[in-house]
Amino acid sequence: MVTIDLITGFLGSGKTTFLKKYAEYLMDQGLHIGILENDFGAINVDMLMLHELRGDQCELEMIAGGCDAESHRRRFRTKLISMRMCGYDRVLVEPSGIYDVDEFFDVLREEPLDQWYEIGNVIAILDARLENNLSQQADYLLASEAANAGKVILSHADVATREQCEDTVAHLNRALEQIRCDRRIDPKKDILQKNLTDLTKEDLEEVSKCGYRLESYRKMDLENGQSFDSLFFMEEKIKPEALERAVPRLFSDKSCGEVFRIKGFVKNGAGQWMELNATPDSHTMQSVAVGQEVLIVIGEHLQEDKIREILKEEETCQS
C-alpha cells in the first residue's frame, strides 16, 4: 500500500516551506514521492512555489479549488486513483489553509482507495505568533486542522517570544474546546517548536513517524456560510516596489476586509519573476525561476474595489 500524509495549516503558517523540507528529506531516503496540491480558489499558486522539487523522484499534481465541496471531493478521489498508477512510495497532500479535514479521511475510506492507500501521518503547521482575535470560523478551522494531527509544528518560533508560543497553544486548546473536541494539545508530547528552515534530519525523521489521531468534534458548515473569500488580480502590472508599499496597507485598512494572506508573482524591471508571500506579521519578496502574473488575496469579507484601489494608488505613487 502507498503511504499518504496530510499536511495542514492555517493561512500563512508555512505549510509550503515545511513541505519543501519534508519532501527533500523523503527523497534523501530514496523514496519516490507525489505531491498533491490543493489551493483555495481557482488558481494554484503553490504549485509554482514548489516547482523546484519536480524531478526524477518527485512529481507535482494539483486540484484547483473554486468549486463546491462535493465536486472537490470527486476531484480529490479521481486524482488519488490516477496517482495510484504512478508507482509512488509516498503521497503528500497539501490542502489550502481553508480545508475540511474530514474529506481526507472520508475519501480514503472509500473503495478502492482503502485497499491502495494507508494513512501515515497528519501534520499541522501553526504560526507561533497566532493572532489572538480570530473569528469563530477561523478558530474552527484552526482546531479542526489540528485535532487529528500526530504532530503540531509551531512555525516562526525563532521570532516569537516564549509568551507568544504559550499563548498560541492555549488558544488552540480553547478552540478545540469550543468545537467540543476532547483532545488537548500537550506542549511536551504533541508540539515541535522550531523555525521551519532549521529543521534537522532528526526532526524530520520524528515527524515522518508521528502518526495521526481520530477525534470527534462538532462540525461547522463553512461552505454555506461563505466565511472566506479569495480574490484574484490578474496582470495588474504592478512593480515589486509598489506592491511592497501596498501590502501593509491591505492588512491594516479594514475597509479592505479582514485580509489573512497575500501571495503571488510580479515581474521586476529586469523581467525577473518575484514571489510575494505575506501575512499580517511578515512578508517576503524573492526572485524565482517560474511565475505567473497573479496576486491572490485571501480573507474574510473582502472588498475587491478597495483592494484594487490601493494597488493602483501605490503603482502610480512616485517613490
Question: In which residue ranges do the predicted regions lie?
Answer:
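Short, amphipathic alpha-helical segments
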Residues: 95-98, 136-143, 147, 159-166
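Nucleotide-state-sensitive switch-loop elements of NTP-binding domains
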Residues: 2-8, 13-135, 140
